[in-house]
């Protein structure tokens, strides 16, 4: 029997209740939400030298892509050579630079060099936003994403960015809608607003801490009563 059930999204909360959980679940934000990326042990000068050695041009705007070949091809189709395309996941022939040898800390830090990130992944979404960089989140093509709200979609809804989430089969018919939003995000210079929204979501960690604190206090009280 569990004394605490922490969940990261509403779909999981509904599932937990559907299988007869005897206690209510508590929304527990992913630790990435309150990660201080500026405090990571990253030598920024050394990282920038590494990026230059891979072909990254710091005089040209860049778009990070954390997914496979299809997404890189879509972004290339939208922007041509206007932006550098930086691959962060699987190497792609459509990327100008593929970064597949970064340390976990460097990888968490590198998003700040982009004007925008395209990704299908939850932690890619969070790390980009934690760096103050806007995101276009693309749903993974799966039976789950067709029938349920994904973790990425749930999170973007919580922080008021649900209009940055798209479903696509990567055909050209979706390009105009996605690009219109991407262009808007790039032009907004919304770094400070993004960081404020992330900090607001991070406040939810207090719920988790308070619940755990109460459990510990209750356990200690029971142990003292039994002594």
Residue ranges and their predicted role:
Residues 1-227:
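Active-site anion-handling motifs in enzyme catalytic cores
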């Amino acid at each position: 029997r569990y004394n605490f059930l922490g969940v990261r999204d509403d779909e999981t909360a509904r599932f937990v209740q559907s299988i007869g959980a005897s206690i209510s679940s508590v929304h527990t934000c992913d630790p990435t939400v309150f990660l201080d990326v500026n405090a990571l042990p990253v030598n920024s000068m050394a990282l920038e030298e590494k990026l230059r050695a891979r072909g990254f041009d710091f005089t040209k705007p860049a778009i990070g892509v954390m997914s496979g070949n299809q997404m890189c091809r879509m972004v290339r189709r939208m922007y041509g050579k206007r932006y550098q395309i930086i691959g962060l996941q699987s190497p792609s022939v459509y990327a100008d630079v593929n970064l597949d040898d970064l340390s976990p800390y460097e990888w968490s830090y590198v998003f700040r060099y982009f004007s925008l990130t395209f990704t299908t992944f939850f932690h890619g979404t969070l790390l980009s936003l934690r760096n103050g960089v806007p995101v276009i989140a693309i749903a993974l093509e799966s039976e789950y994403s067709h029938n349920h709200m994904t973790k990425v979609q749930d999170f973007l809804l919580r922080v008021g960015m649900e209009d940055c989430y798209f479903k696509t089969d990567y055909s050209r018919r979706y390009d105009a809608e996605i690009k219109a939003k991407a262009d808007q995000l790039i032009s907004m210079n919304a770094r400070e607003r993004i960081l404020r929204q992330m900090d607001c979501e991070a406040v939810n960690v207090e719920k988790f801490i308070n619940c755990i604190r109460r459990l510990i206090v209750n356990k200690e009280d029971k142990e003292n009563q039994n002594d």
